Amino acid sequence: MFKGSCVALITPFTEDGVNYEELRKLLEWHIKNHTDAILVCGTTGEGSTMTLEEKKEVIKFSVEVVNKRVPVIAGTGTNNTKASIELSKYAEEVGADMVLIITPYYNKTSQKGLYAHFNAINDAINIPIMLYNVPSRTGMNITPLMLDKLADLNNVVAIKEASGDLSQVAKMAELCGDRIAIYSGNDDQIVPILSLGGAGVVSVLANILPEETHNICEKYFLGEVIESRNLQLKYLSLANSLFIETNPIPVKTAMNLMNFNCGPLRLPLCEMEDSNLVILEENLKANGLIK
C-alpha cells in the first residue's frame, strides 16, 4: 500500500507503437519528483486502445525501470472477466505491486454479477487489488454496501473512487474504511476525500504537476491541513482544464505543449477543439508550465 499521489500515467505513443524511450524518461521524472506510485495502462494511459501485447510490454517495462523504488500498479481490468484474469496474472508474474480493476463497462451487470467478477479475479491472483469505480464512464456504480462486501475478499485492499459523490464516499468510509484504502479518483476532491480518511489520489494532474500533487497529500498527512487545502484550490482551475474534453485528451496535449514527446492520441480520441485548447494553454501559462 502507499499513501499519497499515484500518477495515472499517460502512455507515450509513436505513430505505430509505444515510445519506450519517452516512457522511461517519464518514469524517472516521476520518481525524481516524489510521485508516490505509478499506474500504467489505465484510462489516462489509453489502455482501451492498446493491444494485449502492448499492455503486457508496458507493464513489464515499467516494473523493470521503476525497480521497486515506488509501487507500480497495472491497469488490468476489462469488461471480460477471463481477459482481466489473464492480464492480472501476467502483471503478477512480472512483478507489478498491485492491479487496478475497473467495473465491467458496456455489458453492464447486476450487483451480483459485479461481485462475481471481482471475486473470480481475486481468487485467481495473489497480489493486491485496487477496485476502480467510475460510473460516468462505465454505467455501473460500486455501492457502499457492495464495497463493504468486496472488502472481505483477501486481495481487495483499495478503491479508486471517482463517482464524484462525497456522500457515497463518506458511507464507504463508515462501512469499511478500516478494511480498505480509499483513494480519490478526482483531482478536485483530493482534500475532501483525505478528510474522510482517504489514503491519497490516483491523479491525472500529477502527469504535469507531480511534486505539487504529492505535496497536497503530504501536507495533509503532516497535519498542515490549511496548506493542503490552499494547494488544492491553487491548482483547481488547472485540474479542471484537464477535463475540458474527455480525459486523456487535454493532459496529453498539455504534456506535448510542455515539450514532452508523448506523441499522438489513438482514435477514437482526437485533437482538442481550438476553443478548448486556448483555455488549456491559458491555465498552463498561469501556472508557469509553458510560456
Curated annotation (Swiss-Prot):
The record marks 43, 106 as: Part of a proton relay during catalysis. One of its GO terms (biological process) is lysine biosynthetic process via diaminopimelate. GO terms for cellular component: cytosol. Pfam families: DHDPS (PF00701). PROSITE patterns: DHDPS_1, DHDPS_2. Keywords: Amino-acid biosynthesis, Cytoplasm, Diaminopimelate biosynthesis, Lyase, Lysine biosynthesis, Schiff base. The keyword Lyase applies. SUPFAM superfamilies: Aldolase. Gene3D superfamilies: Aldolase class I (3.20.20.70). It catalyses: L-aspartate 4-semialdehyde + pyruvate = (2S,4S)-4-hydroxy-2,3,4,5-tetrahydrodipicolinate + H2O + H(+). Its EC number is 4.3.3.7. Pyruvate binds at residues 44, 202. The active site is at residues 132, 160. Belongs to the DapA family. This is 4-hydroxy-tetrahydrodipicolinate synthase. It comes from Clostridium perfringens (strain ATCC 13124 / DSM 756 / JCM 1290 / NCIMB 6125 / NCTC 8237 / Type A).
